[in-house]
Regions:
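A short, contiguous, amphipathic alpha-helix enriched in charged residues
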Residues: 125-133
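N-terminal accessory segment detector
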Residues: 1-98, 107-124, 139-153, 160-170
Length: 170
């Protein structure tokens, strides 16, 4: 058997990835909806955030472990992307002097918008902050724009965390 016999076309790979992402979006949506329906909006949303934070921090710790194994420092440029690049159309842009990632194709958000509940979907986006917290808490992901907030695209930037300086005793 030739290697080419095991290859699939890029279009078919993308179709399959998007189908899997669509199902993941539905799964998240219906878990989130069930939690808020059963526990009430406030308690349900709190529990969703708790789960998303735990999930994201796990991903971040795994990325940190991989960076450590390769002898890399835990800086944003060494955080491995965990998104299938075929499914998310991203570009690097510079806005106000800082490098950001702008995402035009957002498979998960598109499903949540179609389901009519962008607010519950938006809670999932906090996974990015949790991933960086797990990878290196000295940095944070910031969503400067998000389609689930009504923006035309999603835009993210990684920034150093600003620590509050304790006031000295007088």
């Amino acid at each position: 058997m030739k290697d080419s016999d095991n290859m699939i076309a890029k279009d078919e790979a993308l179709r399959q990835i998007r189908l899997g992402l669509r199902r993941a979006a539905f799964l998240y949506h219906f878990f989130a909806k069930t939690l808020t329906d059963e526990l009430g909006e406030s308690q349900g949303r709190d529990l969703i955030r708790k789960a998303i934070d735990a999930y994201g921090e796990h991903i971040g710790r795994e990325a940190r472990r991989r960076a450590d194994e390769r002898g890399l420092s835990p800086t944003p440029e060494n955080f491995e992307s965990d998104l299938p690049t075929l499914a998310w159309e991203m570009e690097r842009v510079v806005v106000d002097g800082e490098e950001r990632v702008r995402v035009q194709q957002r498979p998960l958000a598109e499903e949540w918008l179609a389901l009519g509940e962008p607010g519950k979907g938006r809670l999932y986006c906090f996974v990015d902050q949790a991933k960086m917290q797990g990878f290196n808490p000295d940095y944070e992901y910031v969503h400067t724009r998000n389609v689930l907030d009504g923006d035309p695209y999603c835009e993210l930037v990684v920034r150093p965390v600003k620590r509050k300086v304790p006031e000295s005793a007088s």
